[in-house]
Regions:
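Glycine-rich phosphate-binding loop
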Residues: 46-87
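C-terminal binding/interaction regions
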Residues: 77-132
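Generic secondary-structure signature for well-ordered alpha-helical cores
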Residues: 14, 22, 26-33, 52-56, ...
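Glycine-rich phosphate/diphosphate-binding loop of Rossmann-like nucleotide-binding domains
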Residues: 1-40
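Short, ordered loop/turn segments at secondary-structure junctions
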Residues: 11-12, 68-69, 103-107
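General structural feature for long, well-ordered alpha-helical segments within catalytic domains
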Residues: 4, 16, 20, 24, ...
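Short beta->alpha junction loops
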Residues: 36-46, 105
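Short beta-strand segments at enzyme active-site cores
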Residues: 38, 61-66, 98-104
Length: 132
């Protein structure tokens, strides 16, 4: 039986995110999984509500979050990343479904982000393995 995935993806860095989504699709197909739902959100801060909705969806087996929290001049990105990680883990445990973390950063430069597009596939593979 195929694992059915939902993908929550940040739209702020849309060219990079398009490439990550494609990597996620290729990885899902290679694992015998399908991406049945994709929801674009403004950024990581907005992702938890979508993740919770996906985990509540009985047609989905797991959720994958894709994003990029870039290096900034303040600690805002680090705070967002840490907060989201905690919330995602709480939701995963509450609903008993995996949440794959394909978020680059926080604190990554544009060059580092380009080199980490494959984080999307890693998140898909981890989610599929945990859902099985």
């Amino acid at each position: 039986e195929r694992v059915r995935l939902g993908v929550c993806i940040g739209e702020f860095h849309n060219k990079l995110m398009d490439r990550m989504l494609e990597d996620a699709r290729v990885s899902a197909e290679a694992m015998g999984a399908t991406i049945d739902k994709v929801v674009w959100v403004p950024g990581t801060y907005e992702a938890p509500l979508v993740v919770e909705n996906m985990l509540q969806d009985p047609t989905l087996d797991a959720c994958v979050v894709l994003g990029y929290i870039e290096k900034g001049s303040t600690l805002h990105g680090q705070e967002m990343g840490a907060t989201f990680s905690i919330i995602a883990k709480q939701l995963e445990l509450e609903y008993g479904k995996p949440v794959g973390m394909g978020i680059i950063g926080p604190g990554a430069t544009a060059e580092q982000a380009e080199m980490r597009v494959a984080y999307a596939g890693n998140a898909v593979r981890a989610s599929v393995r945990m859902a099985r």
